[in-house]
Regions:
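Short beta-strand->alpha-helix junction loop in the catalytic core
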Residues: 37, 144-145, 163-178, 230
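Membrane-proximal helix-turn-helix segments that form the acceptor-binding/catalytic region
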Residues: 113-139, 145-147, 151
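Conserved donor-binding/catalytic core segment of Leloir-type glycosyltransferases
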Residues: 139, 182-201, 207-210, 224
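Nucleotide-activated donor-binding/catalytic signature segment of Leloir-type glycosyltransferases, i.e.
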Residues: 236-256
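Short alpha-helical donor nucleotide-sugar binding micro-motif in glycosyltransferases
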Residues: 252-253, 260-265
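Short hydrophobic beta-strand element within catalytic cores of glycosyltransferases
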Residues: 291-294
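Conserved acidic donor-binding segment of nucleotide-sugar-dependent glycosyltransferases
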Residues: 306-317, 324-328
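A charged, aromatic-enriched C-terminal amphipathic alpha-helix characteristic of glycosyltransferases
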Residues: 328-359
Length: 359
């Protein structure tokens, strides 16, 4: 039995889950989740026979005893330790452990300062020990997560480097969802941003870049911002001060409507600073045939976008140049192996190679 274990049924995990179920058979695969899905994923509970809540009968035993466990979005350290002690194959997909704690001016406050907290330090020490076992495999989501996990190991092994390879990971998409299209050579440029409105998402950069283009005479650029959050009122005021007619705010919508909006727009921007461990909406936008631009600091854009389509977080002028130069541009190419089908094949190969040895 193969189990995928996450905090909830997520649109970011479903493509991989479906591919694993197709290869293993529904009778040999379970997607176990902690909380009820939201945001357009609720129907999955009824449609997919291989999903189950963690508090359902038999779920706890399944997580303890399944041949292969792939966990993400949570850190069930005790479960991992019990499985590894029995030699059961356990894989852990993770975003950043050491996201910056904030910024002092333009300089990030090192996230490794979290290790000063006794509880966080104890947890990190336990994970560093888990990484010694051939029954435990880390799957870092994005380049910064890989760096963080290597740092966790070094901190508790007297500076020694982690010898085994970490397997780079991500949130994978189903291929072929959208027909090939280009950004229009003339007419309106429609820019889209989707997510939770938090300060480190740097949505202000996108607002300012669009305003800069319009102030410079390009009146055919518009921006749609989809989502809610504590920054919404501030961003609405900012957009209004900078010529709000070009910016439309849309409340949070379900994943089906997000995909529709992606097909209705031309350009997607991931503007986050280094606090963003990944940024799954970027890969979804690329799947829908959008031209995508993203920051050097966000995990998804660092992993998926070529350098000419990236900019430094907060660099309004650079983003404005990218948007202005997008007319006639082809969609951002998805790396050929970055599909759910390819990820499922790699996952099963990784699990097959792992050594199930009790510790």
């Amino acid at each position: 039995m193969f189990a995928l274990y996450t905090n909830t049924v997520s649109a970011h995990q479903l493509p991989l889950a479906r591919e694993l179920a197709a290869r293993l058979g529904a009778e040999n695969f379970r997607y176990v989740y902690e909380t009820e899905p939201t945001g357009g994923n609720q129907e999955t509970r009824e449609r997919e026979p291989w999903t189950m809540r963690a508090d359902e009968s038999g779920a706890a035993e399944l997580l303890e005893d399944c041949e292969v466990l792939l966990a993400g979005g949570l850190r069930p350290t005790g479960l991992f330790e019990r499985r590894v002690a029995r030699g059961l194959k356990t894989l852990y997909q993770t975003e950043r452990w050491f996201k910056p704690l904030g910024y002092l001016g333009s300089s990030p406050v090192p996230g490794s300062l979290r290790l000063l907290h006794p509880g966080y330090r104890r947890m990190a020490r336990r994970f560093a020990r888990l990484m010694e076992s051939p029954s435990f495999q880390v799957l870092p989501i994005g380049p910064w997560a890989e760096r963080d996990m290597k740092e966790v190991f070094r901190r508790f092994h007297a500076g020694a480097e982690f010898a085994r390879a970490l397997v780079p990971w991500g949130y994978y998409v189903a291929p072929g969802a959208a027909a090939a299209r280009r950004v229009p050579s003339d007419g309106e440029l429609k820019v889209l941003w989707v997510g939770r409105l938090l300060d480190w998402k740097r949505v202000d950069t996108v607002i300012d870049a669009v305003a800069k283009l319009r102030a410079g005479g390009d009146g055919l650029v518009s921006l749609t911002i989809v989502g809610d959050g504590p920054e919404k009122a501030r961003l609405e005021r900012r957009a209004s001060r900078r010529g709000g007619a070009a910016v439309r705010f849309v409340p949070r919508v379900d994943i089906r409507r997000v995909r529709e909006l992606m097909r209705e727009h031309d350009i997607y921007v991931l503007a986050s600073n280094a606090v963003e461990g990944w940024g799954a909406a970027l890969s979804e936008a690329m799947e829908e045939g959008m031209v995508a631009f993203g920051t050097e600091e966000a995990g998804a854009s660092a992993a998926l976008l070529p350098e000419p389509r990236r900019f430094r977080s907060g660099d309004v002028a650079a983003l404005a140049r990218l948007i202005a130069g997008a007319r006639g541009m082809a969609p951002s190419p998805m790396p050929p192996d970055f599909t759910a089908a390819g990820a499922a094949e790699r996952m099963l190969a990784v699990a097959e190679r792992m050594k199930g040895e009790p510790r």
